[in-house]
Swiss-Prot record:
Catalytic activity, as annotated: 5-methyl-5,6,7,8-tetrahydromethanopterin + coenzyme M + 2 Na(+)(in) = 5,6,7,8-tetrahydromethanopterin + methyl-coenzyme M + 2 Na(+)(out)
Protein's recorded name: Tetrahydromethanopterin S-methyltransferase subunit A 2
GO molecular-function term, one example from the UniProt record: tetrahydromethanopterin S-methyltransferase activity
Enzyme Commission number(s) from the entry: 7.2.1.4
Amino acid sequence: MFLMVEKKPVPEDWPHIVGDYVVGDEESPVAVVTLGSHMEDEPVKAGAAISGPLHTENLGIEKVVGNVIANPNLRFLVVCGAEVMGHITGQTMKALHSNGVDLETGRIIGATGAIPYIENMPEEAIERFRRQVELVDMVDVEDPDSIAARIQECVVHDSGAMEEEPLILKVPEIGKGDSEENT
């Protein structure tokens, strides 16, 4: 017997920050970043709400954070796929989730990537992201079956939506340029 967990309505325009991603069931508790690997819609078919690559450790991470906090149903972030050389986006995402950001410099604490700075987001957004999702570390895992199994495991352990409402960032810099380099 499945217990129904509480879900919240997802904002109509979610995901509102432009990027290279595929959207699935918006009420799913799972978001997936595939780092340097392109897995098309495989994570979404496995049950993820949103999935896409993450090439940069600054604007790309800001886009992920902005779209995650805008959907309170998201409770897991699966970080999988090949690490991006130089940018090291997987390690940077893990550092952001574990350590946050130096408020004076904007540098992600403990990140080893080339330019790990969050410049377009308030502290409130970063802290909300860190509270909202559990990070599932699958860096360097590219096997679709392993990733699908972990997504399903997260779906089974869904604790329901955050009590807080969606946090929609009105940051004009995020999403500008629209280029692949900024995903």
